[in-house]
Design a protein with these regions (language model features):
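A short, Lys/Arg-rich alpha-helix, primarily the initiator
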Residues: 1-25
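Residue-level recognition of specific faces of alpha-helices
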Residues: 17, 47-50, 76
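DNA major-groove recognition helix of helix-turn-helix/homeodomain DNA-binding modules
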Residues: 59-76
Length: 79
């Protein structure tokens, strides 16, 4: 896994947690994006990277789909 080039931003509070949960489940970012797209979220790699890096706001639909893919609750994304 590559290390993050930039520090985390402050546009959201879930990005770091999403990244940690995704890597814990050993899901590559590109595979995760594909799963999101399959579930109806129109997202590209740059936009997703910004979400994990906390440099953009996550939508409610994105949070719902992310929690579903990670088999967790939306609440856990905020912890």
């Amino acid at each position: 896994m590559k290390t993050r080039k930039n520090n985390y931003g402050d546009s959201n509070i879930v990005g770091k947690n999403i990244e940690a949960l995704r890597t814990k489940k050993k899901i590559k970012q590109k595979d995760f994006i594909s799963k999101m797209q399959t579930l109806g979220v129109d997202i590209n790699p740059t936009s997703y990277s910004k979400l994990e890096g906390q440099h953009r706001i996550a939508t409610d639909k994105e949070l719902y789909v992310i929690a579903k893919i990670l088999e967790t609750s939306i609440d856990e994304l905020f912890e």
